[in-house]
Amino acid sequence: MSVLTGKELRIVGFLCNWCSYGGADTAGVARFTQPTDLRIIRVPCSGRVNPLFPLKALLSGADGVLVSGCHPRDCHYSEGNYYARRRLETLKEFLPIIGIDPRRFEYTWVSASEGQRWQAVVTAFTERVHKLGPAPKFEDAKPMYVMPNLDLPAPLRPLGCGVNPAAMTELKDQIKAALEAKEVEFVMGWQKGFDGLHATPLYMRKPEDVEKLIWGPLNVHSLATYLPLFKGKKVGIVVKGCDSRGVVELLQENLINREDVVVFGMGCNGTIDINRVLAKIGDVTEVESVTGSGATLKVRADGKDYEFAMQDVAQDKCRACTVPNAVIHDHFAGSPTNIPDGAQPAMPAIMTFLDGLSLEDRMGFWRGHIDRCIRCYACRNACPMCVCRDNCVADSREPHWLTQEDSPTQKMFFQLIHAMHLAGRCTGCGECNRACPMGIPVGALKLQMGQIGRASCRER
C-alpha cells in the first residue's frame, strides 16, 4: 500500500547520508511499496542529529520522528552512530516527562543496500503512529494551573539555622589572612540584603570588608555562578556543599583554573525557601529581622514575631542534601556537618507528583505553568552551569533556535533546551527554581533528566 488508510500524518525522518538515505533510495529504485507520510531530512551522520531536532519537531506538531543511521561498527565517521544512540535513547526516556508518547519516536539502523529493511522499518513505524493517531498539540493541551500542596519528605538530616560563633570567627580569620597575604584580589561571600529576609553577594577586597560577612539560612545564592566571569584572576569564594559541586563541575569543564581559585568552606545546616516564609507570614510591608536558634527560625515583620521550624521553610534541595560540607576546599572552618549512617534521600515531592500523572496531564501541567513564564531568563542567569550567556540560544539569530513569540511552545522549548544542555552537568543546586519570579518548577525538568542519565550510567 502506498499510503495507509486514513489521513496522512506528519512524520519527520532524519536519515544518515551514507547508509539510511541510500537504503531509502534503494527502496525507491526497486519500487518497493511504502507509506508516503514520511518527510525526509538528509544529514551527514546520525551523530549530527541534535536531540533538540526531534524534540522541536514533536513539540511543533509532528506526529512522529524517525532517526536512522549506519549499523554499529559501520559508521563512516567511526563513532557517530554510537553518540547518536546514547543521546537519542536518553531523549526517548525524556519525552514522557513532558507528556509526549515515546512510541512516537524511533531510532534504527539501515545500510545503503537494505532497501527491503528500509521498507519494513518505515512501514512498521508509520503503522504504529497511525494507531496512535494525530499527536496532541502542546498549545492545545488543557492547562493545569494549580500546583497542589505536596507532602514534603522528611529531611535527610536535622536542619538548623544557628551559627557557631567560633567557626564564624575562624572563617573570617582565614579570609582576612588570604586578603592580607595578597593570595586573592577579593573573596565572594554573602552580606545582609535590603531587608532582614534577603542576603546579597559580598565582594571582600579589604580585611575590614570581612566584618560584613554573614553565614546561615539566608545564604541561598550559589556564588559559583560568578566564577567564570573572573577566569584568569585570583579570587576566593565561600561555599556551601551544593555550591562546591558547581565549582567542581566548572573545573572539570576547564571554565575556571584551579590555581586561580581559593575555596573557603563551612558546614551547612540548610537554607530557607524565601517564598515559603513569605507565604506563612502573609502580606507584610517589611521584614525587619531573621534570626535562628537551633532548629527554629525567628522572623520579625511589621512589628510582629513569628517562629517556624527550619524543616518547614527549608528549600526542597536541603531535604535531600547529601553534601552539606564542601567537597573541595582550601580552608574549612569549624566541624563538618554529619549525615546519619545509612540515610537515603527521598524522591523530591514534585517528581513524585509528576510521576503519578498521565501523559495528557503532564502535558497539561507544563502547558499551564509555562504559560506564566515572562521570559526573563532568571533561571538561565542564576544557573552556575549556564556559561554561554554571551551567545545564548534564546538571543542568537544564527542559528535561529527560538523566536521572540510569546507562545507556550517557544517558552517550553527554551526550558527543554536548558534541560538538554545540563544533561550530565546539573548539580541539583536548585538555583533555577529559586530565581524564577513566577514560581514555575523548571528545576524538575533538570532533576528528571539527571535521573535518566544516572540510570543510563548504571546500566552501562
Question: For the regions a protein language model found, what residue spans apply to each?
Answer:
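Intrinsically disordered or highly flexible coil/loop and linker segments, enriched in small
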Residues: 131-138, 184, 327, 379-382, ...
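Iron-sulfur-associated redox domains of electron-transfer enzymes in respiratory
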Residues: 1-366
